[in-house]
Design a protein with these regions (language model features):
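N-terminal glycine-/serine-/threonine-rich phosphate-binding loop
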Residues: 1-57
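Glycine-rich nucleotide/cofactor/substrate-binding loop typically near the N-terminus or early
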Residues: 39-109
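Active-site/ligand-binding-proximal alpha/beta "capping" segment
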Residues: 83-132, 136-138, 380, 384-389
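Active-site loops and adjacent core secondary-structure elements that bind or stabilize anionic groups
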Residues: 152-160, 164-335, 339-369, 391-398, ...
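Glycine- and Gly-Pro-enriched alpha-helical subdomains that act as flexible
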Residues: 273-293, 417-463
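Cysteine/selenocysteine-centered motifs that mediate thiol-based redox chemistry or coordinate metal-sulfur cofactors
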Residues: 301-302, 308-317, 442-483
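C-terminal binding/interaction regions
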Residues: 320-342, 464-505
Length: 507
């Protein structure tokens, strides 16, 4: 233990008073002189504990509607004064500035105010000035001062007060200083991002919540998730989500968001291997599973409707890692919980991020999330035969899945059902061949089915192979210098083709 310091004077200035009482009572027990302002001062006085108003220390009242309370040399001098420097001690004595050994702050809730949809004027008033200054000053002088920058550090402080009787060593203070600069940098980043509003190409992120995962993509890799999963899901049971689980859950949530009617999807390694839209969850599940029961084994399941007990009985026949739904019947939960390792998630209503960020080389790539999804009005027929209403429905269904599948990708669909797909291939024609093979493997007829491609056809061989397999309608973005060759082939063979002008690469 090194450079032991005893807390004798404390400044407390917090926005949220929750959980403050035990700390104040412990400080009072130890005989610490407490200084405070405004609402915090009133809170402490209501506890029957003596407190010195900061105004008595500075001889200045709170001014400008509370904008200036603690910004004064008699406050910051007591925080920044170096206890081992005789000249600092002399000045503190000369100007009658008491040493402040502990500073407790809880900042104005800037991020919550922004998220609430408050007016610009209200948001500006929630930019903390005095609090952030106190945090930085106390953290800078952590050699002598204990800084508690948020409620997250209250348990640590209580432990120091009870177990060490208000004494702290340098290691204690340094750890709290690190937390303080984390709080202050996060706060300033949030303010910058509010003002920037994506106007300038500047990437600043600060995510305070993190969770160490069992491992990364493979057991020899370390994995960490930064964010608050509890804002998106309630985990009913199961082991902790792994790195790969999280990637699959992310893909599943993004895919299911495309569908309004009752839909069930099964994913494996970020790609859909079964998707169906039907009147009920049970029907959608059965049809989705039939699409590729082999790949579905050990997959991630998601639906946008409540899972009932009958559906749960059928779902439970499959080994799966994760199931996600907005709600479950109580009986359905009991059925699904029979296998203890199953991860059962209740998805909460939440707005998904509008950006995607990933590392590349020695930097970071950021882009807008691919939030565009074509509707019937976006389709441009380019062939003599126009698609039927059912074909249009199947084309749009296939396009939704195609958008969320690794490139190069081809998707076959019919009657609101994913029949098969070819994914992650280095050539488009190979993706098409893969999709044909998988459809045949599971006994699906492609006669009258529709096909979606995430990008244009560089040659007419794709539409030729598709027609020979039974495909009657095609959706693709177009843009190839050989588009006309594909169109000509479709015209000669009665295939309907529509173009969207929108590519959906996914890497």
């Amino acid at each position: 233990m090194s450079e032991l310091r005893k807390i004798e004077g404390a400044l407390i200035s917090v926005f949220d008073k929750d959980n403050l009482e035990p700390i104040v009572r412990e400080l009072n027990r130890l005989g610490v002189t407490i200084y405070s302002t405004g609402g915090t001062q009133a809170f402490i006085e209501e506890l029957g504990i003596s407190v010195v108003p900061v105004e008595d220390l500075t001889s200045y009242p709170s001014i400008l509607g509370g904008r200036v309370k603690t910004l004064h040399p008699k406050v910051f001098g007591g925080i920044l004064g170096r206890r081992e420097l005789q000249s600092d001690i002399a000045q503190l004595e000369q100007y009658e500035i008491p040493a402040l050994d502990l500073v407790i702050v809880d900042l104005y809730p800037f991020e919550k105010t922004v998220a609430s949809g408050a007016s610009h004027a209200d948001i500006i008033e929630k930019i903390d000035i005095g609090g952030i200054s106190l945090i930085r000053a106390a953290a800078k002088n952590h050699k002598d001062v204990v800084i508690v920058p948020s409620k997250e550090q209250y348990p640590t402080l209580l432990s120091l007060l009870k177990d060490k009787q208000g004494n702290t060593d340098l290691e204690d203070r340094k750890a709290l200083a690190k937390a303080a600069f984390n709080v202050s940098s996060h706060y300033d980043t949030a303010i910058f991002n509010y003002f920037n509003n994506d106007e300038e190409p500047v990437l600043k992120q600060s995510i305070q919540s993190s969770k160490v995962l069992r491992y990364g993509e493979n057991p020899h890799q370390k994995g960490i998730f930064y964010g608050k999963l509890e804002d998106m899901f309630e985990q009913v049971q199961g082991k902790e989500l792994s790195y790969n689980n999280l990637l699959d859950v992310d893909a599943a949530v993004s895919l299911i968001a495309e569908f309004k009617d009752t839909t069930f999807a099964i994913l494996k390694h970020n790609n859909a291997c079964g998707v169906a839209t039907r009147p009920t969850v049970l029907e959608a599940w059965k049809v989705a599973l039939a699409g590729d029961p082999v790949s579905a084994f050990g997959g991630v399941l998601i639906t946008n409707a409540k899972i009932d007990a009958v559906s749960a009985e059928e779902i439970s026949k499959l080994f799966f890692e994760v199931v996600i739904a907005p709600a479950y019947e109580p009986a359905a939960l009991e059925i699904l919980k029979a296998k203890k390792n199953r991860i059962i998630l209740i998805q909460k209503p939440v707005t998904l991020s509008k950006k995607t960020v990933r590392t590349a080389l020695n930097g970071v790539l950021e882009q807008d999330k691919d939030s565009v999804m074509e509707t019937a009005s976006d389709l441009t027929p380019v062939t003599d035969r126009k698609p039927t209403e059912q074909e249009i429905a199947d084309l749009l269904f296939a396009a939704k899945i195609c958008k969320h599948t690794k490139s190069n990708t081809i998707v076959f669909a019919k009657d609101n059902t994913l029949i098969s797909s070819g994914t992650g291939q280095t050539s488009r024609v190979d993706a098409l061949r893969q999709a044909v093979v998988k459809a045949n493997e599971f006994g699906f007829s492609l006669q009258g089915a529709s096909m979606a491609s995430d990008a244009f056809f560089p040659f007419p061989d794709c539409v030729e192979l598709a027609k020979n397999a039974g495909i009657t309608a095609v959706i693709q973005p177009g843009g190839s210098i050989k588009d006309q060759e594909s169109i000509d082939y479709c015209n000669k063979n009665g295939v309907a083709m529509v173009m969207t002008g929108i590519r959906h690469f996914k890497h």
